[in-house]
């Protein structure tokens, strides 16, 4: 099941990331990313609200997916993660290379100026894999820990659409 999550991450190139503002309100932003397995890399401006939010509180929520006309085709991820700046020069360089390779338009802009940009990583803690081809509302949950990845049995929730309980 971990490979299914990695496949979805590898298929898309844009994610929504939600951070917590100082006033407690969530702030969601779209960012380009690259991944190595379940480890996500992205670049932000040091002057951005999301950078300030992450420096203050590393907890983030991430969504990866795309719009579908047919709900039965939804395949997406909802992720709880901890984000932080990549400070190790070798890992930072690796992250930049992955991002620029995955996003050629960014590569044409040149390398990020590290005085103004921060290379970030997000360590996934909980990964919910949405796969509605297995049934409307189908979700498998992965818990990622230092010892490995554990899967929680699938949760199916048709939201009342298929059970006849939906109100018109």
PLM regions: where:
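Short beta-strand segments
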Residues: 13-46, 52-54, 60-66, 73-79
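Charged, amphipathic alpha-helical segments
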Residues: 1-3, 48, 101-106
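Short, basic/aromatic recognition patches
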Residues: 1-15
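Alpha-helix boundary recognition
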Residues: 9-10, 55-56, 100
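Short, basic and Ser/Thr-rich N-terminal targeting/leader segments
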Residues: 11-13, 26-29, 113-116, 123
């Amino acid at each position: 099941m971990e490979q299914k999550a990695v496949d979805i991450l590898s298929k898309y190139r844009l994610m929504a990331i939600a951070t917590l503002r100082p006033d407690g309100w969530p702030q969601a932003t779209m960012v380009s990313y690259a991944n190595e397995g379940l480890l996500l890399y992205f670049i932000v401006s040091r002057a951005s609200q999301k950078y300030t939010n992450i420096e203050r509180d590393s907890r983030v929520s991430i969504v990866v997916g795309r719009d579908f006309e047919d709900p039965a085709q939804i395949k997406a991820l909802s992720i709880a993660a901890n984000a932080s700046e990549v400070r190790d020069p070798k890992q930072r360089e690796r992250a930049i290379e992955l991002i620029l390779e995955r996003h050629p338009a960014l590569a044409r802009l040149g390398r990020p100026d590290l005085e103004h940009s921060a290379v970030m990583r997000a360590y996934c803690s909980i990964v919910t894999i949405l796969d509605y081809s297995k049934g409307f509302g189908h979700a498998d949950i992965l818990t990622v820990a230092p010892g490995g990845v554990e899967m929680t049995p699938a949760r199916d929730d048709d939201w009342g659409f298929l059970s006849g309980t939906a109100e018109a």
